[in-house]
């Protein structure tokens, strides 16, 4: 029987749930929230409810979310194994003891929690965390001490950076591995902003230079890292942001005909702060990046995805501009929102999903087979399908018409705990789905489910893969017949998906060697789409790893092009050679497809197709690319051709993308500098890259000599690099070449120095432009870098209260003093106590309903460079939640209604509103509204509710 008050809550709930929306706080259950442990507790659920804590430290560690804090009440607790001891002493998960427990509440740290099973050498460290250590024999004896000390030492080493190491005998240095080499570790100490944790990673190949870049999210911003030499990564720049545990990144690259060059933008969403969507202009690469002034219409979102893009370069796959698919924003229920990139610097909202279902992550497929006509609603020459992973189901949408998305199907599955993300196979017939909570909720080993999408309107589960540990699978991406998974505590996992329904483990690199449990630690993201074959991995706890996958070395052979570039005149054909190397076992095949760069579909007649080899045949195959003579003088145009979907067990080698350059008939070849003036500094990137480009024609051989012919910088003292030599292009090679100079930091204050490089003795080509380039080198203080504005996290406060805006965390990379300017952007006008101080305050206005105010902080350095950041303050009619901006949308809920709902949901869910049994409730009700506020404290106070057991 349901008690009367609970029944009333159910009735109120039924009538008011439309005001409540599930937001990104539900997206990673337990992430960034305190966990509670107390003697007499029960090890079940996620330890999020202080009224119903867990019993053991080990259990709490196993379910801790990203950025979690574990609060331990007074009492005695055993540290059962070296892994738990490591997590306590290393600080990778914040653990605090000594909380006084009064009734069902954890009060401030006033007492002592006693730990047993801990060696005495950790006593002083743990004392500062509120613990008393009892050094019993169990804690002193055996391999436990040695193992814990080894883990602590390894953690310190990893923070400083791990050396490159091939995978030999199951080890790559200190990491367990299988067929994956460690090329480089770009640790937190290598990042100029000194972050403490990493989030997601994406990447792209800059078509101006063919240099490769990883874009890495961190807790305090986003870095662009040059990984062209994967053994020596270098940070190009860092864009500061508000502190947050979640950042997601995608890229769009396009050719600007007015400037005759490629331009690229990175799009960064942040959850847990009010940064909204950052747009980073990367068109200044290889030397600089900058954040644009774009202001998004949302202030928080969990994920971003760029539809209709090639994952290696970020260029559009069709003649339509890509859409940004925003997942889990603070607007409405966090459902899909589409933004056109018609103006890449200013994404503009087009339309969103018609349903109110929170979308956590997304992927998309361009369908060109018969399904586009029989199964899509809006298809024309193609159908663009969006895969919507929305916590409870996998939804498939037709977004071919961006302004009118149509849902084609909704697919649940057994043991669904949290439908998180997924990717598609290159035959476009299967998707691989990640559930982020099934390992915890159902005690499963790592599980990836495989669905057939032969019928887009009725996907069917056809298989699954289970790992050897319970580590959580996070995200995955397909390249050929390899599936690369960021496997949290297990690091990088590589699957062979030759048979998509039966994936097989073929590679791994354990970037988190401390445990393989179900905690949210270790590898967050991975990116396997670089032309070079480098695979990037972002690890929450230790930063960026660059790896090489050797699982592609198989007896069936590897497919690759025999050159990175080919060329032909309009009206003729280009012949491309595809090789099978490393083995010839079995019957195999590989597909190929065109990706338009500057050569549009009307410039060639290449159709996608398949090449086949019988067993024992290792001969070459040819792809004929007819080039159309359109009669227009267009300059040298570029087409990309990609090998895809290998079958029979053969794999894609590193060179699976090539360029075909289309010459105007009779055009003459020229060689010149991409930019004739570049600027760099002795610090920071400390590298000068001069890009040489070939234009006009790429059909014959060409070469040119270069030499340092002037400038005030001295070779060997001020810079290192070749001071003279010859750069050559083979026949058909139209790809850019790079001259690289490493700049030395001499220290002290000196004038700007220069390097002058001249071109001469061109063979097979003329010299374009002046044939001279100048590098300007700023002294040890570096080029003046724009400051970083940090306006603080969003706040929720009650009306008529004092609100403090704190911008004191703003900083200048050059150490310059800053000036401050606070401005109110939106909302009822208030009076700021100061507009020119780092910290200002105001009194929240009287409001009739919950109202959001937005403020902008602009900081400027003495040279005039500036940066801006915004923050929000939501003013409520009642008591403020003080949640610091959890990313939830505005709500107008009577306090007593919210109070009753919180209380009832906690009772129904066994003191945990996030238990899987009650997903039907939490799909409509935001459990995060019940935490960290007066509502929570009252809802947990039994004296206010005489509710008997139901």
Task: Indicate residue ranges for each PLM-predicted region.
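Beta-solenoid repeat scaffold
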Residues: 69, 80-114, 126-130
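A cross-kingdom C-terminal cell-surface attachment/processing module
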Residues: 892-912
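Short boundary segments that mark the start of a structured unit
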Residues: 551-785
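Solvent-exposed loop segments of extracellular immunoglobulin-like
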Residues: 814-821
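Right-handed parallel beta-helix/beta-solenoid
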Residues: 24-59, 76
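Surface-exposed, flexible coil segments in extracellular/virion-facing regions
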Residues: 821-842
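Glycine-rich repeat segments that build the extracellular carbohydrate-interaction surface of secreted
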Residues: 35-39, 60-78, 93-99
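Feature marking well-ordered beta-strand scaffolds used for ligand recognition
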Residues: 108-557
């Amino acid at each position: 029987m349901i008690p009367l008050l609970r029944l009333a809550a159910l009735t109120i709930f039924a009538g008011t749930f439309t005001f409540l929306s599930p937001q990104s706080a539900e997206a990673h259950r337990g992430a960034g929230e305190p966990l509670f442990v107390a003697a007499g507790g029960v090890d079940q659920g996620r330890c999020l409810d202080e009224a119903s804590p867990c019993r053991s430290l080990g259990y709490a560690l196993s379910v801790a979310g990203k950025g979690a804090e574990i609060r331990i009440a007074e009492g005695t607790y055993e540290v059962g194994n070296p892994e738990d001891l490591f997590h306590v002493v290393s600080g990778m998960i914040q653990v605090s003891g000594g909380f006084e427990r009064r009734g069902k509440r954890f009060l401030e740290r006033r007492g002592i929690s006693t730990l047993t099973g801990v060696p005495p050498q950790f006593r002083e460290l743990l004392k500062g965390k509120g613990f008393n250590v009892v050094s019993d024999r169990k804690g002193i004896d055996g391999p436990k001490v040695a193992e814990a000390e080894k883990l602590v030492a390894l953690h310190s080493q990893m923070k400083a950076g791990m050396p490159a190491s091939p995978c030999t005998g199951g080890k790559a240095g200190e990491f367990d591995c299988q067929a994956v080499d460690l090329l480089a570790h770009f640790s937190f100490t290598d990042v100029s902003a000194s972050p403490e944790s990493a989030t997601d990673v994406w990447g792209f190949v800059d078509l101006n230079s063919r240099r490769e870049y990883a874009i890495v999210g961190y807790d305090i911003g986003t870095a662009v890292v040059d990984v062209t030499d994967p053994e020596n990564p270098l940070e190009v720049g860092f864009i500061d942001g508000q502190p947050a545990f979640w950042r997601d990144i995608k890229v769009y690259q396009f050719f600007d005909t007015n400037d005759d060059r490629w331009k690229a933008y990175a799009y960064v969403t942040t959850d847990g702060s009010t940064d909204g969507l950052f747009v980073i202009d990367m068109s200044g690469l290889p030397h600089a990046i900058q954040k644009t002034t774009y202001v998004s219409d949302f202030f928080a979102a969990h994920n971003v995805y760029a539809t209709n893009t090639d994952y290696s370069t970020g260029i559009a796959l069709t003649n339509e501009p890509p859409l940004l698919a925003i997942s889990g924003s603070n607007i409405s229920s966090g459902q899909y929102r589409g933004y056109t990139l018609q103006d890449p610097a200013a994404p503009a909202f087009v339309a969103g999903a018609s349903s109110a279902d929170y979308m956590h992550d997304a992927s998309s497929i361009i369908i060109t087979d018969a399904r586009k006509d029989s199964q899509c609603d809006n298809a024309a020459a193609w159908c663009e399908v969006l895969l919507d992973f929305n916590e409870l189901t996998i939804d498939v949408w037709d977004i071919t018409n961006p302004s009118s998305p149509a849902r084609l199907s909704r697919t649940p599955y057994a043991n669904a705990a949290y439908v998180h993300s997924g990717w598609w196979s290159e035959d476009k017939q299967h998707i691989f789905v990640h559930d982020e909570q099934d390992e915890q909720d159902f005690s499963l080993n790592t599980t990836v489910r495989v669905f057939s999408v032969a019928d887009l309107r009725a996907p069917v589960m056809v298989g699954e893969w289970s790992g050897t540990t319970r580590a959580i699978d996070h995200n995955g991406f397909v390249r050929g017949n390899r599936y690369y998974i960021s496997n949290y505590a297990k690091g990088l996992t590589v699957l062979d998906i030759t048979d998509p329904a039966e994936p097989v483990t073929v590679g791994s690199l354990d970037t988190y060697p401390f445990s393989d449990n179900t905690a949210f630690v270790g590898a967050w993201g991975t990116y396997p789409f670089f032309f070079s074959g480098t695979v990037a991995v972002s690890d929450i706890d230790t930063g960026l790893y660059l790896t090489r996958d050797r699982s592609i070395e198989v007896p069936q052979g590897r497919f690759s092009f025999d050159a990175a570039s080919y060329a032909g005149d309009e009206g003729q054909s280009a012949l491309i050679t595809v090789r099978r190397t490393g083995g010839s076992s079995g019957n195999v095949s590989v597909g190929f497809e065109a990706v338009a760069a500057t050569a549009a579909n009307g410039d060639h007649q290449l159709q996608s197709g398949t090449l086949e080899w019988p067993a024992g045949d290792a001969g070459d195959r040819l792809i004929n690319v007819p080039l159309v003579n359109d009669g227009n003088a267009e300059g040298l145009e570029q087409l990309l051709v990609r090998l895809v979907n290998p079958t029979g067990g053969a794999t894609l080698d590193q060179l699976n993308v090539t360029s075909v350059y289309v010459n105007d008939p009779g055009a003459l070849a020229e060689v010149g500098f991409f930019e004739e003036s570049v600027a760099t500094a002795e610090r920071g990137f400390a590298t000068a890259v001069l890009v040489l480009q070939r234009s006009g024609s790429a059909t014959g051989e060409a070469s040119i000599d270069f030499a340092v012919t002037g400038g005030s910088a001295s070779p060997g003292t001020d810079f290192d690099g070749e001071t003279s030599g010859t750069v050559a292009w083979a026949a058909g090679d139209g790809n850019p070449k790079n001259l690289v100079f490493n700049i030395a930091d001499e220290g002290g204050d000196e004038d700007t120095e220069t390097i002058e490089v001249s071109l001469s003795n061109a063979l097979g080509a003329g010299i374009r432009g002046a044939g001279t380039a100048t590098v300007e080198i700023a002294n040890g203080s570096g080029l003046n870098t724009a400051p970083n504005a940090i306006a603080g996290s969003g706040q929720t406060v009650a009306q008529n209260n004092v609100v403090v805006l704190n911008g004191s965390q703003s900083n200048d990379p050059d150490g310059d003093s800053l000036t401050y300017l606070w401005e109110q952007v939106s909302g009822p006008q208030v009076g700021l106590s100061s507009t020119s101080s780092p910290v200002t305050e105001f009194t929240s206005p009287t409001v009739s309903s919950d109202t959001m105010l937005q403020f902008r902080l602009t900081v400027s350095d003495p040279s005039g460079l500036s940066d801006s950041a915004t923050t929000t303050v939501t003013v409520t009619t009642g008591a403020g939640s003080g949640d610091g901006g959890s990313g939830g949308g505005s709500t107008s809920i009577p306090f007593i209604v919210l109070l009753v709902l919180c209380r009832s949901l906690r009772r129904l869910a066994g003191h945990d509103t996030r238990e899987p049994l009650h997903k039907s409730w939490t799909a409509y009700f935001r459990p995060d509204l019940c935490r960290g506020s007066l509502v929570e404290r009252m809802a947990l106070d039994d004296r206010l509710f005489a509710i008997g057991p139901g």
